[in-house]
Amino acid sequence: MMHLKNIKSENPKTKEQYQLTKNFDVIWLWSEDGKNWYEEVNNFQDDTIKIVYDENNIIVAITKDASTLNPEGFSVVEIPDITANRRADDSGKWMFKDGAVVKRIYTADEQQQQAESQKAALLSEAESVIQPLERAVRLNMATDEERARLESWERYSVLVSRVDTANPEWPQKPE
């Protein structure tokens, strides 16, 4: 199975390549071990999955046809077309690590960013519930049930706003 690492654009290495670059603006892609992508792409097997991954091992593309890839700035590996490998996608939630496709392992910073996004989404959801209830109270149109619901959502909103995204513990959402 082929594995081309750290593919980057570099200068042509032969007179023929130089001429192609001069005439057609060809960009030459080379792996870290000096292999030419355009020659190697034909050596991938037809019955395998080709995975493109970045410098952090995050999968950014998956295909059966290597000729459809533009791997500049990435690495490409072919893996067996088996069920365990077919579960991966290019959503950013999978990685190629130690020769296998695995669920992505997030760094502490990435986990905190995800928690911050979740916090913002939960606060937005709470505000969308709170606003019409506040309006009903302000206009003296709220039922006792709506007043109680408003209070529980406001309490929830305050608790969410206090969540430490470095170590999140999310409060129970009101019903």
Curated annotation (Swiss-Prot):
InterPro entries for this protein: Phage_T4_Gp38_tail_assem (IPR003458), TFA_Chaperone (IPR051220)
Domain of life from the UniProt record: Viruses
Knockout consequences: Viral particles lack tail fibers in inversion-defective gin mutants (blocked in G+ orientation; no switch to S'-U').
One of the Pfam families matching this protein, by short name: Caudo_TAP
Compartments in which it is found: Virion; Host cytoplasm
GO biological-process terms attached to the record: adhesion receptor-mediated virion attachment to host cell; symbiont entry into host cell; viral tropism switching; virus tail fiber assembly
A single GO cellular-component term on record: virus tail, fiber
Main location: virion
Induction remarks: Expressed in the late phase of the viral replicative cycle. Expression of late genes is activated by the viral late transcription activator C. Expressed alternatively with tail fiber assembly protein U'. The switch from S-U to S'-U' is performed through inversion of a DNA segment called G by the phage invertase protein Gin.
Record carries keyword Chaperone: yes
Keyword tags: Chaperone, Host cytoplasm, Host-virus interaction, Late protein, Viral attachment to host adhesion receptor, Viral attachment to host cell, Viral receptor tropism switching, Viral release from host cell, Viral tail assembly, Viral tail fiber assembly, Viral tail fiber protein, Viral tail protein, Virion, Virus entry into host cell
More info: The orientation of the G segment is defined as G+ and G-. G+ orientation provides S-U fibers whereas G- provides S'-U' fibers. S-U and S'-U' dont have the same host range (e.g. respectively E.coli and C.freundii).
Stated family: Belongs to the tfa family.
Annotated function: Chaperone involved in tail fiber assembly. Remains associated to the tail fiber and participates in the host receptor binding. Binds to the primary receptor. Two alternate tail fiber assembly proteins U and U' are encoded extending the host range of the virus.
UniProt name for this protein: Tail fiber assembly protein U
Organism: Escherichia phage Mu
Biological classification of the source: Viruses, Duplodnaviria, Heunggongvirae, Uroviricota, Caudoviricetes
